[in-house]
């Protein structure tokens, strides 16, 4: 019953559509201790119906997340220290990426770099 109600609320997908047609989500997430949070957030965006999901993690974690969820595009962000993003460089890269929605935070370590990226 709930599944039928949910399906009725969702718009019909254009059969001629492509990944870009169904929305682009940018997820900025993850740290050494919380790689799973980044992966689960990206997978949730895919499962929710997003057409194109880019998962941005600290550069040293990019090889760890690449290919774990095949539907995700993974991208490494510049780091200030191991596993912590360099705020100015990361914010500049994030600003260049196309997105209809932005999710920032799951699994990011609290710190100056994280706070600065969120503020920018």
List PLM regions with ranges.
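Small-residue (G/A/S/T)-rich helix-start motifs and N-terminal tracts that mark the onset
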Residues: 1-120
